């Protein structure tokens, strides 16, 4: 169904221009983090362009890093005059200057997937906006999009483009490891890829198809009556009725509560901010 309102971006290989102040913010943040040896990797629109040549308007700069590195980065940037905010300690902080911002992302909002040091170690050297930096590897970029399947935003096309653009030359063992217990989300993305690009289904290696489909068939043939409802991990709003009215499991709250490492604002920074208030 077509909804009137703000036009959605149309895919293209054309690189989108940034506002001059926006570009300077991104460059300054990248340089400061690099100069202070904060381990991170660029993701989002810049990583997608790097790996697929698909251009997209960059409303922000996505930086992936561990929770510990995020706290260090916030400390460094706040001391340099940037306005910093921990929006959700489970996964998101923001760095602002004027009307523009940078996102620090430490995992998925549902806490099903968390950025670890291995994500950063596997990042690839590149140049973003003239600044030498590192960009998320395609395997981690793909994994970061598996749960972006909400009604208002869906990254299935990005996953399909990653597989298509790389011709499937990916570390599939790594992708399977990243998916872990959520392998069915990966399988659903691969089935969509096969539907979109039927002539390129071989880009996903046959052993990967076999492993995932066999696991699915085993689950179907031997269903677990105690298996828990997982809808809230997919879209907490669309499946709110299941949790709030029908009494089904709220795995989202459980996952978020069990998140081992949240973004913690440095204590001395909190004191500085309170003293300035």
Where are the language model's segments positioned?
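Short Asp/Glu-rich motifs
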Residues: 52-53, 96, 182
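Anion (oxyanion) recognition and catalysis
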Residues: 34, 78, 127
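Short, flexible loop segments at the rims of nucleotide/cofactor-binding pockets, characterized by
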Residues: 17-19, 62, 113
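Conserved catalytic core of two-metal-ion nucleotidyltransferases
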Residues: 79-118
């Amino acid at each position: 169904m077509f909804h009137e309102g703000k036009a959605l971006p149309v895919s293209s290989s054309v690189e989108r221009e940034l506002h001059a102040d926006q570009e300077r913010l991104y460059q300054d943040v990248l340089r400061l983090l690099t100069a202070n040896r904060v381990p991170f990797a660029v993701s989002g629109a810049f990583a997608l362009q790097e790996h697929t040549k698909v251009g997209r308007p960059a409303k922000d700069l996505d930086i992936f890093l561990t929770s510990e590195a995020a706290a260090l980065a916030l400390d460094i940037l706040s001391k340099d005059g940037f306005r910093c905010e921990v929006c959700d300690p489970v996964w998101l902080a923001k760095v602002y200057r004027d009307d523009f911002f940078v996102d620090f992302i430490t995992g998925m909002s549902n806490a099903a997937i968390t950025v670890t040091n291995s994500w950063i170690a596997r990042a690839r050297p590149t140049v973003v906006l003239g600044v030498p930096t590192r960009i998320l590897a395609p395997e981690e970029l793909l994994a970061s999009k598996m749960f972006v399947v909400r009604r208002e935003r869906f990254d299935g096309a990005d996953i399909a483009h990653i597989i298509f653009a790389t011709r499937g030359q990916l570390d599939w063992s790594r992708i399977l490891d990243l998916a872990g217990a959520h392998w069915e989300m990966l399988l659903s993305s691969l089935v969509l890829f096969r539907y979109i690009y039927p002539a390129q289904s071989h880009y996903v290696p046959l052993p990967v198809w076999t492993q995932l489909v066999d696991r699915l068939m085993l689950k179907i043939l031997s269903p677990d009556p105690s298996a828990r409802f997982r809808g809230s991990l997919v879209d907490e709003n669309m499946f709110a009725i299941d949790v709030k009215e029908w009494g089904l499991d709220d795995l989202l709250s459980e996952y978020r509560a069990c998140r081992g490492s949240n973004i913690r604002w440095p204590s001395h920074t909190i004191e500085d901010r309170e003293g300035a208030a």
